[in-house]
Amino acid sequence: MTPLDTIRLYGTAPDSIVDGPGLRFAVFVQGCTHGCPGCHNPDSQPACGGAVRRIDELAAEIEANGLAQGVTISGGEPFEQAVACAELARRMRALGLNVWTYTGYRYEDLAALANRAAATGAVCAAHDTPAASARPSLPSVDPSGAEALLAATDVLVDGPFVQALHSFELPWRGSSNQRLIDVPATRTSGRIVLWDTHEDFPEKPASW
């Protein structure tokens, strides 16, 4: 457990060209419960590893970088530090940087968790009583944090890494089951909207 104004990191890459379009500042969080065989960053899995950093210091470092066209939050599993990652993502968008978030969870499960928590919270507040349905179905994910991180993400790369589906031909994904989801468009339309890319040049979503 880390203080609310901190984030536990596996590391950073201030000039990544493989974690989304353009030159990006990649932030790799520490801790992941998925345990995908063939994981690219297995040392990022233990929750007690890495180093704890203040979010405001990390945000200042990214702002001072000056070259990054966007920020990618990867890991590890960002949604297992959803509150901290959401705060970082909000600050990055306030700077005019687009945010990509990688997760081993599926968008539908994260959205359902966030929506169910919001609905249950409203019912509990109205009746002043807790409800068993408030318990999240993803025990390692904070429901309100999941909602906040989804709201602060432009593109979500979702789904676990599946070694049998691995291909080096996939842009910004490790396996073909993973999707590049335009989160603002998806949340507006109520259906999955994939982020459009061309072979040579990534299209910028209208929501950016």
Language-model features: locations:
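Short glycine-rich, flexible loops that bind phosphorylated cofactors or substrates
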Residues: 80, 164-165
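N-terminal [4Fe-4S]-dependent radical SAM core
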Residues: 1-28, 41-47, 192-193, 197-206
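Conserved Radical SAM active-site core
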Residues: 5-10, 23, 41-136
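P-loop/Walker A phosphate-binding loop and immediately adjacent motor/lid segment at beta-alpha junctions
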Residues: 166-208
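Well-ordered beta-strand positions
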Residues: 153-155
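Short pre-active-site segment immediately N-terminal to redox-active cysteine/selenocysteine motifs
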Residues: 28-35
